[in-house]
Amino acid sequence: EGCDILLNREITSIDMDKLIVFCDKEKINGDLIISTISPDFLYKCCWGELAYVGRDFFKIVLPNEKVLPDDVYFIYYPNENEQQTRITECKKFTLHKSKNSLITMEVPSLKNKLYPTMIQSQLDLAEKYIKNLPEKIMSVGRMGTYRYVDIDDIIMQGLKFKEEL
């Protein structure tokens, strides 16, 4: 209530002093900007680009009612010798019933930006960007804060943030 939420827009630039967002050849003014994008984008990477790790997702349907044990939703493979990093049995999150199981296998990739690299120099750089944001620009979420945060924690952050506004 009292705000416009715009989805699926490509941001081309942001005037942080005037609180203007340019996207899809459109100029959007506001009195507050809540950003979920990487803070280096806001500053056009003036102090350097923040490093992220991505994932490629491979979907596999198996003719089994279940693949993983009942209380296991996903399995991590943190071993350097394993190419994939996680396998997830998707229907366990939705409680969907089926004689087949969809699993996803995640493989490290540089094609997209999903997870911040938890290297001190990168954390320091992110902190520099975030601390220099104008008072009326709030940076939230995994990319906005450059922290590895699970989706349930991000939702709780969003609800808390809404109450603080």
Regions found by a protein language model. Give the residues of each.
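PAPS/PAP-binding and catalytic site of the sulfotransferase fold
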Residues: 1, 33, 158
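Short, well-ordered alpha-helix to beta-strand connector turns
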Residues: 2-3, 30-31, 134
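A conserved short coil-to-beta-strand element within the FAD-binding core of flavoproteins
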Residues: 5-23
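A structural signal for the hydrophobic beta-strands that form the central parallel beta-sheet
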Residues: 5-7, 35, 139
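Flexible, charged surface loops at secondary-structure boundaries
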Residues: 16, 27-29, 133
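Mid-domain catalytic core of redox enzymes
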Residues: 25-128
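C-terminal catalytic lobe of FAD-dependent flavoproteins
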Residues: 116-165
